[in-house]
């Protein structure tokens, strides 16, 4: 009986609205009942209006009530209700006073009647909703046991009809809350959805759960009833509406229900969701991709499942083929999460992810641009050999002119990695004013190491080993970058930044025109100061027998190597050579010849080779007892080290007695020059040896500047997995409980 009443319920609202004017004169501008000066007349008016409303209403709700008793109760309640409605909507207005509301309407101005009508209309609407809310809740509560029974019926037709009724109830808030309060009914809906083969029943049951998922209580009821595995099964449905209801319900569960993510993973939800990326509805794809992001965020296993099911390729395809901003944004969020996974990164890059993301760097959507920038930044260390990135590189150079910290961090980091060991990219960036843009970025960055360090690394790459390297070295000077770069050597800058700056200074010193401005910027005293500090720190650990620790990811031995190598190149200039000598550095350089690190031995021998060109310095080198370690280095496996050692020995032996010179000559001939006449000639004539620093990294020790070193993925603004502050669907926070089409706007 209650179920039948549910079908008649909408009639009540319409009829109440149609007869509502009898309770108020606002609609017609006059009372619908004739005013009376007697109290009896007024009472009769109330009763007449009330009876008219009561007569209509009781056709739905008084079935089964004895006529005499039911009529009396309903007349009393509705009479009082009509009176309350009138008093609430038009307080203080009697039948006689209502005629005063009539006024002549002036064109362009609201009449008194119209102004009075505005609040009354709002109140009327509120009353309609209130009556509906109460009656919906009561009817739904009474019908729940019967509906639960019908949903469990063996007759599919009965089950379908019951599902349709419950679906109608779930569309109204009051009855929906009643449904959520019945675990038995929700469980019956889940069972029906899971077991049915009827498409209409599947559509109704998924729609019911979708409607319930707009409330926290509904989400909990679905979760406790085992709804998640059932919803995951529905992702295989051929019916588009069923797919939509299932994915949006799962999306709401993932957003707001604790434990839902694990439940979806255990139900193999990812394996069902990734193939859905081949659908062609942009709004459906937007919800699906956000589900993937919620599941992959902070969960390495989920990322690998997405990879195994072809997720990177499908996501890149979406970025390449669609223009719907919300879809591009949600897809870029998934790619950003995957971009810190070592296994997913190559797959994204190989699928053309760098190029697809680069397409959107000029989008009008700031949030999309920022996601693409972070993802490019995180992928760039495995994309150093990628082709077709010319437009991306040009856009990144242009992005260096903006003031947004995140944009600058991403642009500098990506440029640093993409110019690593890639001569073509280095040349392209240099030719497109990349050096100038990077210097300006450094000047604006201030103390923001996240910008300054990758910018310096990019400049270090641009100033070495490509056809336009000399142009880049000169460009730094011409754009007044040298003073700013030298200042970065000051403590308390982080050691990674100091290390990158030392390497850049070494490259700048390869250009003779830069020597004077470098000297004016007092670069040599700063390098010597850093060298002494780093060497002392390293020696303390050697003396204590402890392993050299990393400071911010940098070993002090790397700083020693870098400073010595930079001083080696600077010493080619006579003025610089004299300044280095006067700072009493020779004893330290001689000590470095005993280092266990081959690269340090090489740069130490190199700087001594340059200093030995001056007799005073050569004598000082000899006085420090350098001959013994230099003799040993003649047998070094590193050809450059052996050549430098030979040149120093040859120079300091010039003023020795004939016996000493003969012994040195024999040693040189036996160890090095027997098979290398060119090296012998170089040692004799003291021609500076321009051996390039190799690209290969030592197996146990990473050289300071011997190669371009790609930056690791940033542990910020990417996946908090390392990262990142939770992005949301709006520019502010997520809406608490989205409406049915919150993703479809």
From Swiss-Prot:
Tell me where on the tree of life, at the top rank, the source sits: Eukaryota
Origin species, per record, is Homo sapiens
Sites carrying a glycan are 14
Q: What is annotated about its quaternary structure and interactions?
A: Homodimer. Component of an E-cadherin/catenin adhesion complex composed of at least E-cadherin/CDH1 and gamma-catenin/JUP, and possibly alpha-catenin/CTNNA1; the complex is located to adherens junctions. The stable association of CTNNA1 is controversial as CTNNA1 was shown not to bind to F-actin when assembled in the complex. Interacts with MUC1. Interacts with CAV1. Interacts with PTPRJ. Interacts with DSG1. Interacts with DSC1 and DSC2. Interacts with PKP2. Interacts with PKP3 (via N-terminus); the interaction is required for PKP3 localization to desmosome cell-cell junctions.
Role played: Common junctional plaque protein. The membrane-associated plaques are architectural elements in an important strategic position to influence the arrangement and function of both the cytoskeleton and the cells within the tissue. The presence of plakoglobin in both the desmosomes and in the intermediate junctions suggests that it plays a central role in the structure and function of submembranous plaques. Acts as a substrate for VE-PTP and is required by it to stimulate VE-cadherin function in endothelial cells.
Q: Which disease is it linked to?
A: Naxos disease: An autosomal recessive disorder characterized by the association of diffuse non-epidermolytic palmoplantar keratoderma with woolly hair and cardiac abnormalities such as dilated cardiomyopathy and arrhythmogenic right ventricular dysplasia. Arrhythmogenic right ventricular dysplasia, familial, 12: A congenital heart disease characterized by infiltration of adipose and fibrous tissue into the right ventricle and loss of myocardial cells, resulting in ventricular and supraventricular arrhythmias.
In Swiss-Prot or TrEMBL terms, this protein is called Junction plakoglobin
Q: N-acetylmethionine-modified residues are where?
A: 1
Region annotation (Interaction with DSC1) ranges: 574-661
Each ARM repeat occupies one of these ranges, namely 132-171, 172-215, 216-255, 258-297, 298-341, 342-381, 383-420, 423-464, 470-510, 512-551, 574-613, 615-661
A Pfam family that this protein carries is: Arm
Query: Would I find Membrane among this entry's keywords?
Result: yes
User: Domain description from the entry?
Assistant: The entire ARM repeats region mediates binding to CDH1/E-cadherin. The N-terminus and first three ARM repeats are sufficient for binding to DSG1. The N-terminus and first ARM repeat are sufficient for association with CTNNA1. DSC1 association requires both ends of the ARM repeat region.
Q: Where in the cell is it found?
A: Cell junction, Adherens junction; Cell junction, Desmosome; Cytoplasm, Cytoskeleton; Cell membrane
PANTHER family, alphabetically? ARMADILLO SEGMENT POLARITY PROTEIN (PTHR45976)
Sorted alphabetically, which keywords does the UniProt record give? Answer: Acetylation, Cardiomyopathy, Cell adhesion, Cell junction, Cell membrane, Cytoplasm, Cytoskeleton, Disease variant, Glycoprotein, Membrane, Nucleus, Palmoplantar keratoderma, Phosphoprotein, Repeat
Offer an example of a GO molecular function term for this protein.
cadherin binding
Modifications the protein undergoes after translation, according to the UniProt entry = May be phosphorylated by FER.
The tissues in which it is expressed are:
Expressed in the heart (at protein level).
Which SMART domains does the record match to this protein? ARM
Residues with PTM Phosphoserine: 99, 125, 182, 665, 730
Q: Which biological process terms from the Gene Ontology are attached to this UniProt entry?
A: bundle of His cell-Purkinje myocyte adhesion involved in cell communication; canonical Wnt signaling pathway; cell migration; cell-cell adhesion; cellular response to indole-3-methanol; desmosome assembly; detection of mechanical stimulus; endothelial cell-cell adhesion
Report the membrane topology from the UniProt record.
Answer: Peripheral membrane protein
Protein family: Belongs to the beta-catenin family.
Concerning InterPro entries, the annotation shows: ARM-like (IPR011989), ARM-type_fold (IPR016024), Armadillo (IPR000225), Beta-catenin (IPR013284)
Q: What's in the GO CC field?
A: adherens junction; catenin complex; cell-cell junction; cornified envelope; cytoplasm; cytoplasmic side of plasma membrane; cytoskeleton; cytosol
- Specify where the region named Interaction with DSC1 and DSG1 lies, as residue ranges: 132-297
């Amino acid at each position: 009986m209650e179920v039948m009443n549910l079908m008649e319920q909408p009639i009540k609202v319409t009829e109440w609205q149609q007869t509502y004017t009898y309770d108020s004169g606002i609609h017609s501008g006059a009372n619908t009942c004739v005013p009376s000066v007697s109290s009896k007349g007024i009472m009769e008016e109330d009763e007449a209006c009330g009876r008219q409303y009561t007569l209509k209403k009781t056709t739905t709700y008084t079935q089964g009530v004895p006529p005499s008793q039911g009529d009396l109760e309903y007349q009393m309640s509705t009479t009082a209700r009509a009176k309350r409605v009138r008093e609430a909507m038009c307080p203080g207005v009697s039948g006689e006073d209502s005629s005063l509301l009539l006024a002549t309407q002036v064109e362009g101005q609201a009449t008194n009647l119209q102004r009075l009508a505005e609040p009354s209309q709002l109140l009327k609407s509120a009353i309609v909703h209130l009556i509906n809310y109460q009656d919906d809740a009561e009817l739904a509560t009474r019908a729940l046991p019967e509906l639960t029974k019908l949903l469990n019926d063996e007759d599919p037709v009965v089950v379908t009809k019951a599902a349709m009724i419950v679906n109608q109830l779930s569309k109204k808030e009051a009855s929906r809350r009643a449904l959520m309060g019945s675990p038995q009914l929700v469980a019956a809906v889940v069972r029906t959805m899971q077991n049915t083969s009827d498409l209409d029943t599947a559509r109704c049951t998924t729609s019911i759960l979708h409607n319930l998922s707009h409330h926290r209580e509904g989400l909990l009821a679905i979760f406790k009833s085992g709804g998640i595995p059932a919803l995951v099964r529905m992702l295989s449905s051929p019916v588009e509406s069923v797919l939509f209801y299932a994915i949006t319900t799962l999306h709401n569960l993932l957003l707001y229900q604790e434990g839902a993510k694990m439940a979806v993973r255990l139900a193999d939800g990812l394996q069902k969701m990734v193939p859905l990326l081949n659908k062609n509805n942009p709004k459906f794809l937007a919800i699906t991709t956000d589900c993937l992001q919620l599941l992959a965020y902070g969960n390495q296993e989920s990322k690998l499942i997405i990879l195994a099911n072809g997720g990177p390729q499908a996501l890149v395809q979406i970025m390449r083929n669609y223009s719907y901003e919300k879809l591009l944004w949600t897809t870029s969020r998934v790619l950003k999460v995957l971009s810190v996974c070592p296994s997913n990164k190559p797959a994204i890059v190989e699928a053309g992810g760098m190029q697809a993301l680069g397409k959107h760097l000029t989008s009008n959507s700031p949030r999309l641009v920022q996601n693409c920038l972070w993802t490019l930044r995180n992928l760039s260390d495995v994309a150093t050999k990628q082709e077709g990135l010319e437009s991306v590189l040009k856009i990144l150079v242009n992005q260096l002119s903006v003031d947004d910290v995140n944009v600058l961090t991403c642009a500098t980091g990506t440029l640093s990695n993409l110019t690593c060991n890639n001569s073509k990219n280095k040349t392209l960036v240099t030719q497109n004013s990349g050096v100038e843009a990077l210097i300006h970025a450094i000047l604006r960055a201030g103390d923001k190491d996240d910008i300054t360090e990758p910018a310096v690394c990019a400049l270090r790459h641009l100033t070495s080993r490509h056809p336009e390297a000399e142009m880049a070295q000169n460009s730094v000077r011409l754009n007044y970058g040298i003073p700013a770069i030298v200042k970065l050597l000051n403590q308390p800058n982080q050691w990674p930044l100091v290390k990158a700056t030392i390497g850049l200074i070494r490259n700048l010193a390869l250009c003779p025109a830069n020597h004077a401005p470098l000297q004016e910027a007092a670069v040599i005293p700063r390098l010597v100061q850093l060298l002494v500090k780093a060497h002392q720190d390293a020696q303390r650990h050697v003396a204590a027998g402890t392993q050299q620790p990393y400071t911010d990811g940098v070993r002090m031995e790397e700083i020693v190597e870098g400073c010595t190598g930079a001083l080696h190149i600077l010493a080619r200039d006579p003025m610089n050579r004299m300044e280095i000598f006067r700072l009493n550095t020779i004893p330290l350089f001689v000590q470095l010849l005993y280092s266990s690190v081959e690269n340090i031995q090489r740069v130490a021998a190199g700087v001594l080779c340059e200093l030995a060109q001056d007799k005073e310095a050569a004598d000082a080198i000899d006085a420090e007892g350098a001959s013994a370690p230099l003799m040993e280095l003649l047998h070094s496996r590193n050809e450059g080290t052996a050549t430098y050692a030979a040149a120093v020995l040859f120079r300091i032996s010039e003023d020795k007695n004939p016996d000493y010179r003969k012994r040195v000559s024999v040693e040189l001939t036996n160890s090095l020059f027997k098979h290398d006449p060119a090296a012998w000639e170089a040692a004799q004539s003291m021609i500076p040896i321009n051996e390039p620093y190799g690209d290969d990294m030592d197996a146990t020790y990473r050289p300071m500047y011997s190669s371009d070193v790609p930056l690791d993925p940033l542990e910020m603004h990417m996946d908090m997995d390392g990262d990142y502050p939770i992005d949301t669907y709006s520019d502010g926070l997520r809406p608490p409980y989205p409406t049915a089409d919150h993703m479809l706007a």
